[in-house]
């Protein structure tokens, strides 16, 4: 089962469960944490808002955001690539898609960090629970207001929120609580994974300068480079499921109610699937990794993450020359789920702009 929220809450004493009312209600409605038939229903309605044509229309905007952020990063005194580019790019893109103004990005960064430490932590300490509950309550109020305003005053320049409000499957539509919860999911998942794609990706390229040189010489290899980054050091470490009944797998008994951690990072280095799996090679062929999951829970935002990587990666390599790591061993997030560096300070020489 994908539902690991209900078992977690059910094991808590009543007072502790009540103290997580908002975060429990929100996560319990996330499409990634529910099973069919509810998942089938949510996914069908959300798919109507995440069409290929809607994503394709975002390409010029993403390219413009990339250029603006790189220009600002070059002029900044902060060498941290995560703070200067890897975080604000996907955050700005997804915020615009769900109708959140850029002025609120710092607020959402704080909320998202609180959720990430709760969802991905090996141990949800009282402090992590308290911060996650507070942020879930604030996000519920925030998106509830946005959705109410969109219902009252529809706009011509529609966001994913507008499409989710309008989505219908027969007479069925997303409820208010489902709209709020999955708007938060889109914002959360829509930037966390792509931030790690860029952070882990640049780190891998800098540790393999031959591959960086190949990509710099031929930017058309960006698509393959993104796929190899996703395989070699992708943004997701594990995918968790809960046993519904006792089952024996490879001689090991998994009991009903036990959590099973699928190590996606390890699977993408499986020598039975990939030749020389620990080698980073942006020209690798047949690179069918599973970083975005598999089956009915395959990541809804995978095409968007790939598009951002394919646009942003060659642009930053063109803009930032002679890149060097200022910290050979950067810190990583403490998470069982997400895999990414917290910060990545670099030195570089900015390329001169092309004169028209």
Q: Positions of the model-derived regions?
A:
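Cytochrome P450
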Residues: 1-356
